Curated annotation (Swiss-Prot):
Organism: Prunus dulcis
UniProt-recorded name of the protein: Profilin
GO molecular function: actin monomer binding
Keywords of the record: Actin-binding, Allergen, Cytoplasm, Cytoskeleton
Record PANTHER family: PROFILIN
Function: Binds to actin and affects the structure of the cytoskeleton. At high concentrations, profilin prevents the polymerization of actin, whereas it enhances it at low concentrations. By binding to PIP2, it inhibits the formation of IP3 and DG.
Any one Gene Ontology cellular component term annotated for this protein: cell cortex
């Protein structure tokens, strides 16, 4: 299965008639493995800040998580494994695997829990595969 199929079939999937706004799988060096057409253009320093928070949990909380110039307020996650952010009626979930970052961006009517489930389910699968 190609990385694009993972994005199309597993991240941009239909959940009760709703889907993520955007999704991507990035290498931990910030390279794009695959992304939805709607995924925002991001800066390398935004990915570097996300990776730093995985290594040193709590570093994003004071400043917020930025992706594509959009600021998300960092909310509870799982230290070293998952970062979650909120902005208005939407938000972001970032799951770290051994080699990649799985990113899902959502807005209503999709719920934070649905976004978490979509992103973390694929992330857990890739971890099981050694990726």
């Amino acid at each position: 299965m190609s990385w694009q199929q993972y994005v199309d079939d597993h991240l941009m999937c239909d959940i009760d008639g709703n889907r993520l706004t955007a999704a991507a799988i990035l290498g931990q060096d910030g390279s794009v493995w695959s992304q939805s057409a709607t995924f925002p253009a991001f800066k390398p320093e935004e990915i570097a800040a996300i990776l730093k928070d995985f290594d040193q949990p709590g570093t994003l909380a004071p400043t917020g998580l930025f992706l594509g110039g959009t600021k998300y307020m960092v909310i509870q996650g799982e230290a070293g494994a998952v970062i979650r952010g909120k902005k208005g009626s939407g938000g972001i979930t970032v799951k770290k695997t051994n080699q990649a970052l799985i990113i899902g961006i959502y807005d209503e009517p999709l719920t934070p829990g649905q976004c978490n489930m979509i992103v973390e389910r694929l992330g857990d699968y890739l971890i099981e595969q050694g990726l």
